[in-house]
């Protein structure tokens, strides 16, 4: 380098330490300034260029139009190039004229000139690639300015010293160069306009990071606008940014799915290659037999393949940050030596202070960008896992559903996916922690020599303990997750059947079950927490113990080893660095343990079998046929016997085919087979054209009526009007508060069963499909509506005429109008053909018609089929009881098919006017000008209130509530213990400072024992106090979890039915799962970390102020800055967290809704649409999640700047006051300041996390304080023993509405039912029949009037005293998972003989006795492994056991075939002959022998007399009887 400078004007030396270091006025040599210093920016740009060009090539955002800013940048670049070339030509000019400049004057202008030309070209290339702000060029211009500052100062000082400018030309060109690069730097900080095709031009609220400048991205300033806005106004969903394209669910899930499919293909190839050949020799067979089991697809590998690159980038940031963290201890060492050396130049100390600040700022920036990458990757983890699970849940087979309930799958989507998100920030610790430990040990070795090996040995001894804790924690985690799954599953069942629990007064039994599971869950949590606290002592003490052991060995191993300030506090700083990886290792192990459990669960679910999309072939089939089945054999699961055998069916195109047969013969299974829902064992199935499907029990979405009908299709007003008219929905629209924009509510809760079925049918009609599969759609409506629907929709004259229709039905009167009939028996086709042909055969079908057709028609059946052509439906609607829902379950399938009815509440709750239409359904034709109005929903059209995020700060009462739940004494004790541990920590370090000063006084060795002993005692005391605080917090946290869950559970179990009608079950379950999870496992650790960081920060500031009192001057401005950042951050992050919490519930509600309707979704080929809807809901959640992550980074930059200023001022004041400070105090002060950044940052983070997570307590308390129903027992007003003795029921001027503000559904009802009377209750749909029974049980409370039973006002007694004395057999039979005995007798009140007697009378004895488990036969969730008919018989057995004086039948036999119905009616007449029986009936023939019949019309008594008198009066009842063929 000296040769480049020559020996002339620049001198001959490249470096001169006397000029640059050992002086009070340092400078660099002219040679250094004109060579290396000028080349540094150029070297940087040329080194960065290849990678940057590669990046630009693969990240083109579209070109930016040439702007004035871009032109100005270009001009500056050209001018800089010209200045460099002017310097070069000036050197050549000197050479020509014999002055021979130094070689550097040729090389440097050439290098700088070419580099400036490169920078100019790069500006243009960046513009063409859409770069708005170039980080590479900003750094380049910044380096140019920084490197020019030294010669800028030197030239001025030289000119001042010499009194003249020695080289005017180069002096001038240099300052022109400086002005130009400074201008270029300033211009580079301004952003260009967005690219021509940028999303910002069309997106109203684009993600600001994409268009932010480099400095804004570097310091996260682009978030400041939201922080200020969030401080001034509570953030709402509309204020949130759109997501970047790469962060959207669709892209993330697709990438993960592709990686998972690749894993599955690799596994399939591996299995294929591992399969032994057919002709293997004996030796080969031995070898093959020893092969390992075939491997399974690895979800972990799929995750790494998808997100590995993000982890690699974050790992680079982490590596740089880890290396930088070891620079400050070395700078501290230099600073202490500087303090110890009074002869050292002052600028050394200021330089060290500046370098410590600069190093700390670089650490902060790099660490925050690392966290940004890693947390974003964590969110992508969660997004991808949720999306993959959602897609898998849409295609799992029925055999898988018995193993995976909706509750378990929701846990996979919520808890397990969240655990992967929580794990992401810790993953890099797998390599980072060992690296930091190794580097710390290396530098400690440099400082203390071999003595450090003693500390290392101690750390190695901790590893087995760590492993043992990990094993135990994993075992606890597995057990706890199983219990949590059981609790969530049971809670979903309780929500599903809450109405039944209330009707039977069974809440205490299920309350006891939930509390039993919860007790086991809390016991495991308590054990795990105590195990964790015992290790807390070890981990808290381990860095200190390592320090102590190392120092002890150091001072005792060699008498010449003296512990001075440099060795002690540099070692303490290194041990503080060591503390972080050691302290994070337990959290890493805990998170890895939890994630490994979750990984296994997710992988197991994703590896389950899927439905075969090729089981139903869509290719062209036999000409003229729409459906063909050839030799078809089907089963619901591979391990079960076939349900359908050897089917050979051909359905002509455009035909109307009826499928009939007895209960359990496989009618609904046939529909399922056609949909591809069953597993095909043999044969072929062909279907040509699109399919529409109407399940036996309607599946309704939680959206408007119109959206349910359109089902994703575009609105065609004419077809929409025709559909509503044909499905008899027009009159309903007039009654619904919001017309067709009325929100139907979750599971259609504000519609009657008939209305839900007609909406489901309307969905199929509007779809305009080619093939319609109708699974008994007429069973849920009365005979008049059924006839209307058949005539105008299904029949030969209906809107579906000409379409292929497969109708499962028991409506005898409709059969003559079908093209042909398929008769099933025992899963096989027993007869098939047109109606007349089947009659002529005189087979089982003809015999059945003769037995069960109405009397007046029997004589005509054998004459000709035309005699029945115009017959009315006689209300003999045999409801196929095989599938309780769309197609997922078969009649005789014993498998626990639990998914289908999870989260379902089969409610009879109706809209404000009851169940639907209140008058006959005439054929209503629309005039040309009459249209169904498609308008915005009326204000009262919404049923479910949208969940709103709370605004403002969390009320102090919420913190107080949690403190009371923990225990006030416990809370106080925890705080005092932390005060004690902080005092012990300060004492230990002050004692160490005094110990190091002994070296200056040359104290004797015998003083060392005292110093070491006190230091050890204080350190161990600190760890012991922290352990006690952790144990107290663990005990208090578990206590709080118990109290809060108990309050929530008890309130919800006592909530009125109206609460469940208007609150989505997903929202309630989210509270029981996610919010309780936060209370159980998140809050206590967050509080501990907050206390730890708070007392650490206070301790640091106290120590620094005590060491350097001058520091108090800057405390106030730094505190103001800190408070400002905290205030802006807290307001914004709190609201973002609330928005995230609120937007999470719809994800789970939609998921449960999707799984419930999976068969319908697949039938309509809308799986992809629902995946998009799910992705949209997840994206809505992410829109608050990403800003929340950025808010933490924005906070950290601000807070760590404050912390780094503390480091700067601590070092500066130590330099300024070095004459009055000893090295021990300086070491103590600065080493403490190096910790304050982390403590201050962590304190705000934990404060925010606490406020964010305490929202869970807020929600739990909110749901724990909702209005409850009346007391179960009123001690002062209990009915007498044996009440009611007679069973008299009297309504006195009784009126009722479903909720405040709605219209009355019963108006001034007055009637008297005598004891022992049999009263039938009839009326058109929506008349208020079911409402009347709900009032009797006080599910609905009176708006006016009263109900008296045996003279006692039911409003005066407790609900359980009332409900336990009444019995209902509901319309929708609900069973719970558990034994049959539990479903009949949850309290264990009856003997086994009584239960068998009830089963005998309810015609279930044969079935139950044939089961190996007998009464312990396990019912699946919802009783789905029993047919609907069998479940209804179980409800009859319940009624027989209760033996109450009043029995209510709510269309109880609607799901039973006629033969079973006759048996049940006979049982009721004999066993309840002395009881008062109230029957809501669709089949009028079942009540014709009743004492009286009550006819309701629009909530009032229209007729009330004996059936004979009512028929004679020729009123409403007469009309209904005539329609049914009974009059």
Swiss-Prot record:
Topological domains, Cytoplasmic: 54-73, 121-132, 193-302, 371-426, 472-533, 598-963, 1043-1085, 1129-1199, 1244-1527
Taxonomic classification: Eukaryota, Metazoa, Chordata, Craniata, Vertebrata
Family: Belongs to the ABC transporter superfamily. ABCC family. Conjugate transporter (TC 3.A.1.208) subfamily.
PTM sites of type Phosphoserine: 908, 911
All copies of domain ABC transporter, residue ranges: 629-851, 1291-1523
Membrane topology note: Multi-pass membrane protein
Region called Disordered, residue ranges: 910-932
CDD domains, alphabetized: ABC_6TM_MRP1_2_3_6_D1_like, ABC_6TM_MRP1_2_3_6_D2_like, ABCC_MRP_domain1, ABCC_MRP_domain2
Protein name in the entry: ATP-binding cassette sub-family C member 3
Keywords: ATP-binding, Cell membrane, Glycoprotein, Lipid transport, Membrane, Nucleotide-binding, Phosphoprotein, Repeat, Translocase, Transmembrane, Transmembrane helix, Transport
Residues annotated for ATP 1 binding in this entry: 661-668
Binding annotation for ATP 2: 1323-1330
């Amino acid at each position: 380098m000296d040769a480049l400078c020559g020996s002339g004007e620049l001198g001959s030396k490249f470096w001169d330490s006397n000029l640059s270091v050992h002086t009070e006025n340092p400078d660099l040599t002219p040679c250094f300034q004109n060579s290396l210093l000028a080349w540094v920016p150029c070297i940087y740009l040329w080194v960065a260029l290849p990678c940057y060009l590669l990046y630009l090539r693969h990240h083109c955002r579209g070109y930016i139009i040439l702007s004035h800013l871009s032109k100005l940048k270009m001009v500056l670049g050209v001018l800089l190039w010209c200045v460099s070339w002017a310097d070069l030509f000036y050197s050549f000019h000197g050479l020509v004229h014999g002055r021979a400049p130094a070689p550097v004057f040729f090389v440097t202008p050439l290098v700088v000139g070419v580099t400036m030309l490169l920078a100019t070209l790069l500006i243009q290339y960046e513009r063409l690639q859409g770069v708005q702000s170039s980080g590479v060029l900003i750094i380049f211009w910044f380096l140019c300015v920084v490197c020019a500052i030294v010669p800028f100062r030197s030239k001025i000082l030289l000119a001042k010293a010499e009194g003249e400018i020695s080289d005017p030309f180069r002096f001038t060109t240099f300052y022109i160069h400086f002005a130009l690069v400074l201008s270029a730097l300033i211009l580079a900080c301004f952003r260009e306009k967005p690219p021509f095709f940028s999303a910002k031009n069309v997106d109203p609220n684009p993600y600001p990071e994409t268009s932010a400048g480099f400095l804004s991205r570097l310091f996260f300033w682009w978030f400041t606008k939201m922080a200020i806005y969030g401080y001034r106004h509570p953030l709402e969903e509309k204020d949130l940014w759109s997501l970047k394209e790469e962060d959207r669910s669709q892209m993330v899930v697709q990438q993960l799915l592709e990686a998972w499919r690749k894993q599955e293909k690799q596994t399939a190839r591996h299995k294929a290659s591992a399969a032994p050949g057919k002709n293997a020799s004996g030796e080969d067979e031995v070898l093959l037999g020893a092969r390992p089991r075939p491997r399974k697809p690895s979800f972990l590998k799929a995750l790494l393949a998808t997100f590995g690159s993000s982890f690699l980038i974050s790992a680079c940031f982490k590596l740089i940050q880890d290396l930088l963290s070891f620079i400050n201890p070395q700078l501290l060492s230099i600073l202490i030596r500087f303090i110890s050396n009074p002869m050292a130049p002052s600028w050394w100390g200021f330089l060290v202070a500046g370098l410590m600040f600069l190093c700390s700022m670089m650490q902060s920036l790099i660490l925050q960008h690392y966290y940004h990458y890693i947390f974003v990757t964590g969110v992508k983890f969660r997004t991808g896992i949720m999306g993959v699970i959602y897609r898998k849940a849409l295609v799992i087979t029925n055999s898988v559903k018995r193993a995976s309930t909706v509750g378990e799958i929701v846990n996979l989507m919520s808890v397990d996916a969240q655990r992967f998100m929580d794990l992401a920030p810790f993953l890099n610790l797998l390599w980072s922690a060992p690296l930091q430990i190794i580097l710390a040990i290396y530098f400690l070795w440099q400082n203390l020599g071999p003595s450090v090996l003693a500390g290392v040995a101690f750390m190695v001894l901790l590893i087995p303990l760590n492993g043992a804790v990990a094993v135990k924690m994993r075992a606890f985690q597995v057990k706890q997750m199983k219990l949590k799954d059981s609790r969530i599953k049971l809670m979903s069942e309780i929500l599903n059947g809450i109405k039944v629990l209330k009707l039977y007064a069974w809440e205490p039994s299920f309350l006891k079950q939930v509390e039993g599971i919860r007790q086991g869950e809390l016991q495991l949590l308590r054990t795990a927490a105590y195990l964790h606290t015992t290790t807390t002592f070890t981990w808290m003490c381990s860095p200190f113990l390592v320090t102590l052991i190392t120092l002890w060995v150091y001072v005792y191993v060699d008498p010449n080893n003296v512990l001075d300030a440099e060795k002690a506090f540099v070692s303490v700083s290194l041990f503080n660095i060591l503390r972080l990886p050691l302290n994070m290792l337990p959290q890493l192990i805990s998170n890895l343990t939890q994630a490994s459990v979750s990984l296994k669960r997710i992988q197991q679910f994703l590896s389950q079998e899927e439905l075969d999309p090729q089981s139903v072939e869509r290719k062209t089939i036999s000409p003229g046929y729409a459906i063909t089945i050839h030799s078809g054999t089907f089963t619901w699961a591979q391990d079960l016997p076939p349900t359908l055998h050897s089917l050979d069916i051909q359905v002509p195109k455009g035909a109307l085919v009826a499928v009939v047969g007895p209960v359990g013969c496989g009618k609904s299974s046939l529909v399922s087979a056609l949909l591809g829902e069953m597993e095909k064992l043999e044969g072929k199935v062909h279907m040509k054209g699109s399919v529409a499907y109407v399940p036996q029990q309607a599946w309704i979405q939680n959206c408007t009526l119109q959206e349910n009908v359109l089902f994703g299709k575009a609105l065609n007003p004419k077809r929409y009007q025709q559909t509503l008219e044909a499905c008899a929905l027009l009159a309903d629209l007039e009654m619904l508060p919001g017309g067709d924009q009325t929100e139907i509510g979750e599971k259609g809760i504000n519609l009657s069963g008939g209305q839900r079925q007609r909406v489901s049918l309307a969905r199929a009609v509007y779809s305009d499909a080619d093939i319609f599969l109708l699974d008994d759609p007429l069973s849920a409506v009365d005979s008049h509506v059924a006839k209307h629907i058949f005539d105008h929709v299904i029949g030969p004259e209906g809107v579906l005429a000409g379409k292929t229709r497969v109708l499962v039905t028991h409506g005898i009167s409709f059969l003559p109008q079908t093209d042909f009939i398929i008769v099933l028996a025992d899963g096989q086709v027993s007869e098939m053909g047109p109606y007349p042909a089947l009659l002529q055969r005189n087979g089982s079908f003809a015999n059945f018609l003769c037995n069960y057709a109405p009397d007046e028609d029997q004589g005509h059946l054998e004459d000709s089929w035309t005699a029945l052509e115009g017959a009315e439906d006689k209300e003999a609607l045999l409801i196929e009881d095989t599938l309780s829902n769309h197609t997922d379950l078969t009649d005789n399938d014993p498998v626990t098919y639990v998914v289908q009815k999870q989260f379902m509440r089969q409610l009879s709750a109706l809209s404000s006017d009851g169940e639907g239409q209140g008058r006959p359904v005439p054929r209503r034709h629309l005039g040309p000008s009459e249209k169904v109005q498609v308008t915005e929903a009326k204000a009262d059209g919404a049923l479910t209130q949208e969940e709103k995020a709370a605004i403002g700060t969390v009320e102090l009462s919420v913190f107080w509530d949690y403190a009371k739940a923990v225990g006030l004494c416990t809370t106080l004790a925890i705080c005092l213990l932390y005060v004690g541990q902080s005092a012990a920590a300060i004492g230990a370090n002050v004692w160490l400072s005094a110990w190091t000063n002994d070296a200056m006084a040359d104290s004797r060795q015998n003083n060392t024992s005292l110093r070491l002993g006190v230091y050890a005692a204080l350190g161990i005391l600190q760890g012991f106090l922290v352990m006690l605080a952790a144990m107290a917090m663990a005990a208090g946290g578990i206590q709080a979890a118990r109290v809060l869950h108990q309050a929530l559970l008890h309130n919800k179990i006592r909530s009125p039915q109206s609460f469940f009608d208007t609150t989505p079950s997903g929202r309630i379950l989210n509270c029981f799962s996610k919010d309780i999870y936060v209370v159980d496992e998140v809050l206590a650790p967050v509080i501990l970390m907050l206390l730890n960081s708070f007392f650490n920060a206070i301790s640091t500031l106290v120590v620094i102020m005590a060491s350097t009192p001058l520091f108090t001057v800057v405390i106030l401005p730094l505190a103001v800055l800190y408070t400002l950042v905290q205030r802006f951050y807290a307001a914004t992050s709190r609201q973002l967290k609330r928005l995230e919490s609120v937007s999470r519930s719809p994800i789970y509600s939609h998921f449960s809704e999707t799984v419930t309707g999976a068969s319908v979704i697949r039938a309509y080929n809308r799986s992809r649409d629902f995946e998009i809807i799910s992705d949209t809901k997840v994206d809505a959640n992410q829109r608050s999640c990403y800003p929340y992550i950025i808010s933490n980074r924005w906070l950290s930059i601000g807070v760590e700047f404050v912390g780094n200023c503390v480091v700067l001022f601590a070092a500066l004041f130590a330099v300024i006051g070095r004459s009055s400070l000893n090295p021990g105090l300086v070491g103590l002060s600065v080493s403490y300041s190096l910790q304050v950044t982390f403590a201050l940052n962590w304190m705000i983070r934990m404060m925010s996390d606490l406020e964010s997570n305490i929202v869970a307590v807020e929600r739990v308390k909110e749901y724990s304080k909702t209005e409850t129903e009346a007391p179960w027992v009123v001690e002062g007003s209990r009915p007498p023993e044996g009440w009611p003795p007679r069973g008299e029921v009297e309504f006195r001027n009784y009126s009722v509405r479903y909720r405040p503000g709605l219209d009355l559904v019963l108006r001034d009802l007055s009637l008297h039912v005598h004891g022992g009377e049999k009263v039938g209750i009839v009326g058109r749909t929506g008349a208020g029949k079911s409402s009347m029974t709900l009032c009797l049980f006080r599910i609905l409370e009176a708006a006016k009037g009263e109900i008296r039973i045996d003279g006692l006002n039911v409003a005066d007694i407790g609900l359980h005293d009332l409900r336990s004395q009444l019995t209902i057999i509901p319309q929708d039979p609900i069973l719970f998972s558990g034994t049959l005995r539990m479903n009949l007798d949850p309290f264990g009140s009856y003997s086994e003989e009584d239960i068998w007697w009830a089963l005998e009378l309810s015609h279930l004895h044969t079935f139950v006795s044939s089961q190996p488990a007998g009464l312990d036969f396990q019912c699946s969730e919802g009783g789905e492994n029993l047919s609907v008919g069998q479940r209804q018989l179980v409800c009859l057995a319940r009624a027989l056991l209760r033996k109450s004086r009043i029995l209510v039948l709510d269309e109880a036999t609607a799901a039973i075939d006629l033969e079973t119905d006759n048996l049940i009616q006979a049982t009721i007449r004999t066993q309840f002959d002395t009881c008062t029986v109230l029957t809501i009936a669709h089949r009028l023939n079942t009540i014709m022998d009743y004492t009286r019949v009550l006819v309701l019309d629009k909530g009032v008594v229209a007729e009330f007399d004996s059936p004979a008198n009512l028929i004679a009066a020729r009123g409403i009842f007469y009309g209904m009887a005539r329609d049914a063929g009974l009059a």
